[in-house]
């Protein structure tokens, strides 16, 4: 992904989280229009340490190892400073599942 090309919702990107987490993949959940205008992107980290937690969504075969999207660990990051590099994208069904899990956290039906 070129430095001027903002990531799109549904993109899987490699980025630098911080010194402790290092480079790792993440799913972009904010739309390109927001990412481009603000310079930030909302992302969910991706892990290969699948634990079966309710807010994990299994990632389709895209990574070398089985991986899961951590829907309860949303981060807002400067995608340029974090050197985001697009490595693929998820199908709409995965984005729908991620969105449903996030909504269960922020707008639970009571």
Show the residue positions of the predicted features.
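Conserved functional hotspots at enzyme active or ligand-binding sites that engage polyanionic ligands
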Residues: 1-110
């Amino acid at each position: 992904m070129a430095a001027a090309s903002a990531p799109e919702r549904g993109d899987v990107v490699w980025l630098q989280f911080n010194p402790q987490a290092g480079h790792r993949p993440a799913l972009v959940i904010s739309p390109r229009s927001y990412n481009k205008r603000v310079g930030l992107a909302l992302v969910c980290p991706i892990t290969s340490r699948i634990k079966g937690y309710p807010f994990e969504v299994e990632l389709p075969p895209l990574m070398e190892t089985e991986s899961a999207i951590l829907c309860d660990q949303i981060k807002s990051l400067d995608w340029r400073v974090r050197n985001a590099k697009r490595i693929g994208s998820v199908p709409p069904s995965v984005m729908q599942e991620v969105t449903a899990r996030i909504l269960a956290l922020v707008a639970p039906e009571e």
